């Protein structure tokens, strides 16, 4: 519900402040130190992640950064959400 609200807010703000651009980045499970703090055994956690992601792995921070750079550099992208989730959303 919160994610949908953030996306709706971004679209509304994009419409209001155009031609300035507003976008949302929605990452899936990304391999960061925070994942290690989740309390689960790391190997078990990644085994569970691969079951829910079409690409069979967690994402890497650089992949999120590349998508953000793409959105920043493309002046024609606005009011949208970029899902960086390894196909998790599609698999649901």
What are these regions (language model features)?
Residues 2-3, 10:
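Active-site helix of classical SDR
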Residues 9-10, 67:
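Hydrophobic positions on the long internal alpha-helix
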Residues 11, 15-16:
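Alpha-helical segment proximal to the catalytic Tyr-Lys
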Residues 18-21, 78-79:
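Short, small/polar-rich loop/turn modules that mediate ligand/substrate recognition or access, typified
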Residues 21-31, 83-85:
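Conserved SDR Rossmann-fold cofactor-binding beta-strand/turn motif
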Residues 24, 43-46, 55-65:
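Conserved loop-to-helix N-cap of the C-terminal "lid" that shapes the substrate pocket in Rossmann-like
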Residues 29-52, 92:
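A glycine/serine/threonine-rich, flexible loop-to-helix segment
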Residues 60-84, 89:
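C-terminal substrate-recognition "lid" of short-chain dehydrogenase/reductases
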